[in-house]
Amino acid sequence: MATTGRSESRLFVRNSTGLVRSASAVDATIFNAVISAPIGSTLAWSIFFTLVAFPGADPVGVLVIAAIINIPVLIMFALLGASMPRVGGDYVWVSRILNPPLALISNLCMIMGGLLGAAYFAKFFSVFALGPALVAGGSLAHNNTLISWGNSFQTDKAWILAGALVMVALQTYILIRGTKSTFRWQNGAFLIAMFGIVVAFIVLAFASKGGFVSNFNALNSSFGGGTAQNVIATGGGAHAAPDLGNMSATLPTLFSIQGFMMWNFWSVYMSGELKSASNRRRQLWIMFGALAFDTVLLIIGALLIFHVVGYHFMYAANVAPNK
């Protein structure tokens, strides 16, 4: 008996490859905010550094200017990211809009900057994070061992290298675990940092300048240092004052702050992992949400510190080690 074959027309359905977009809008917004201007380190390193490097700097006013300058940049990246969400960065954009050699140069610079930045922030972890945290904890607990460890992480090259290698190893482990795991670590660290920032802002909001001076004098004397007034006099802070109209101070301050503030578009490099990456409104909300978060918290932090500590003291405290 002959078997009659039947031809069937079927709708082709693509079988899943297991490639799932893992990043939500919240993940991407936090990613942009923390990679661009982590609040604590930006206040300590970029903003207060400008007080001494460029006398007359007005960090609060410059932060507003920096935010305005970033608006057209973010619009451009958001629209390009939504138009070509799977290309994973600006190589395709630059090569199509300008030419491929410029795209290669641009991305090679990005790679080298990333490598140098990884080394810098690994050292940053030892010198500006781990060391001061141990010294502060040891001072509050009257524990000389913690203070000694903290000083070693800031001054001893072997301790600095050990702390940096631990950070690099931890980052490598996190990235190897994959995108979802990376964002869990990122968001967990973000929540811890935000808790510390909120507590610090609340303390500053209810603190007084007189209370700060009294506590500073008591703590600094335990290390053999002088009073707050001595610091101001030694650092020449008595006549320091912000002047936004002073272009000799404002322009270099703008470049310094933009070094941190200009990266709120960075999520375009992971658009292949972002859910609904082709949605323009979503891309705009992610980038502008990060910009608003950074700008508002940095301005609040600077204003609170200047209110309690004073512009004169912050200027002198940053210049005093160089005297």
Label the predicted regions:
Residues 1-60, 70-75, 219-228:
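Membrane-interface "cap" regions at the ends of multi-pass membrane proteins
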Residues 41-153, 157-159, 289-295:
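Extracellular loop-to-transmembrane helix junctions
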Residues 208-217, 289-323:
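Extracellular/periplasmic helix-exit of transmembrane alpha-helices
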Residues 23-24, 160-223, 262, 284-293:
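Membrane-interface loop-to-helix entry segments
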Residues 53, 122-166, 172, 209-250, ...:
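Inter-helical loop and helix-membrane interface segments of multi-pass membrane transporters/permeases
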Residues 64-68, 108-116, 166-173, 250-258:
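Hydrophobic alpha-helical transmembrane segments of multi-pass membrane proteins
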Residues 23-43, 163-170, 223-308:
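Hydrophobic, membrane-embedded alpha-helices of multi-pass small-molecule transporters
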Residues 78, 121, 125-128, 132, ...:
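Transmembrane helix-loop junctions and nearby membrane-interface residues
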